[in-house]
Amino acid sequence: MSYGCQVSDDEPNGSKAVSLLLRLSTLALALTSAVVMATASECTVVQLNGVVATITYKDFPPFVYLVGFNIAAAMLEAAAIYLRLSTGGGDDDDEGFKGKLPGILLVVIDVAVQALVYTATGGAFAAVSAYGPQINACGAGAGRFCGQVHQSKLLSFAGSAAVGLAVVFRDVSLPFSLWPTSSD
């Protein structure tokens, strides 16, 4: 008779739980980054020649890419979460190709999400470096555009880290379990 801790012959599922948590974080961070950038308040500035100009994120192509790429990455990450939860990631060897297809799709989606989020983040950092004076002109007193650009950039960076770690923990076995395993 055993009291206290239950000993199980099942493999620990800690890596699946950590990977799922990081996937959910990626989804939330990428989507939040896109929303913050898309809702960046407009900024009106007077240029050196006296012309009044309104600046939005759409005036900077890398920011438009950030919004589009992060939304696409969030949708793909939602599909990856669904695949992971509904099929377990296609780890079954006894079903042939049909059993391995979800695992193959998961790898393809992981690569696509990484490419989209890394590209969006890199583009945003490059744009802030290249267009610094124009973005900083919308700093204090001229609206929240500058602050929202920096928030979106950092959220996208955090999403980049989360997606990379999710893929690592998908393949690394962690020696603990976070939810009960099946009692079949």
Curated annotation (Swiss-Prot):
<protein>
    <recommendedName>
        <fullName>CASP-like protein 1U2</fullName>
    </recommendedName>
</protein>
<dbReference type="GO" id="GO:0005886">
    <property type="term" value="C:plasma membrane"/>
</dbReference>
<feature type="topological domain" description="Cytoplasmic">
    <location>
        <begin position="175"/>
        <end position="184"/>
    </location>
</feature>
<comment type="subunit">
    <text>Homodimer and heterodimers.</text>
</comment>
<feature type="transmembrane region" description="Helical">
    <location>
        <begin position="154"/>
        <end position="174"/>
    </location>
</feature>
<dbReference type="InterPro" id="IPR006702">
    <property type="entry name" value="CASP_dom"/>
</dbReference>
<dbReference type="InterPro" id="IPR006459">
    <property type="entry name" value="CASP/CASPL"/>
</dbReference>
<dbReference type="InterPro" id="IPR044173">
    <property type="entry name" value="CASPL"/>
</dbReference>
<feature type="topological domain" description="Cytoplasmic">
    <location>
        <begin position="1"/>
        <end position="16"/>
    </location>
</feature>
<keyword id="KW-0472">Membrane</keyword>
<feature type="topological domain" description="Extracellular">
    <location>
        <begin position="38"/>
        <end position="62"/>
    </location>
</feature>
<keyword id="KW-0812">Transmembrane</keyword>
<feature type="transmembrane region" description="Helical">
    <location>
        <begin position="63"/>
        <end position="83"/>
    </location>
</feature>
<feature type="transmembrane region" description="Helical">
    <location>
        <begin position="17"/>
        <end position="37"/>
    </location>
</feature>
<comment type="similarity">
    <text>Belongs to the Casparian strip membrane proteins (CASP) family.</text>
</comment>
<keyword id="KW-1133">Transmembrane helix</keyword>
<keyword id="KW-1003">Cell membrane</keyword>
<feature type="topological domain" description="Extracellular">
    <location>
        <begin position="122"/>
        <end position="153"/>
    </location>
</feature>
<feature type="transmembrane region" description="Helical">
    <location>
        <begin position="101"/>
        <end position="121"/>
    </location>
</feature>
<feature type="topological domain" description="Cytoplasmic">
    <location>
        <begin position="84"/>
        <end position="100"/>
    </location>
</feature>
<dbReference type="Pfam" id="PF04535">
    <property type="entry name" value="CASP_dom"/>
</dbReference>
